[in-house]
């Protein structure tokens, strides 16, 4: 599976044949939401050698006990990032996770994902907090109101660059849903109901 000269199908079949059912199951799951660093009292808490982040003296990008557990024992590689202290901390944390994953059997990399982070207004919602140092853009409804696909295209290029710099490999925001229920939390992420 590590031989780049083989086809994707051959490599996948070889890797799948080496994995246990538990390892395969872990690769199909997502982690709980991850805040970096996980603050005590917050919704996404974590410990470092049994201590809270503030008590531990660890760097803000250190891997928590819980993160080590889901990487090593539960074989999870899909991770949902929520709050981050800063883009720099996010990038360093992502690098630490990737280094850790490389040392584990099979060296399967991390797939770090995020809900939208570039909304023009900081709502305070944990899924949209990306640090104030990234670009701000309209939500989906705002792009639809522009009636200019080039604006949306430029956003996609900018957000892609920023996400990769943060270590994020999967954006969970793009939606093609037509929203007809205004009470739905994801309404602003769609292009509206009259597209």
Identify the function of each model-found stretch.
Residues 1-195:
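N-terminal beta-rich core of secreted/periplasmic extracellular enzymes
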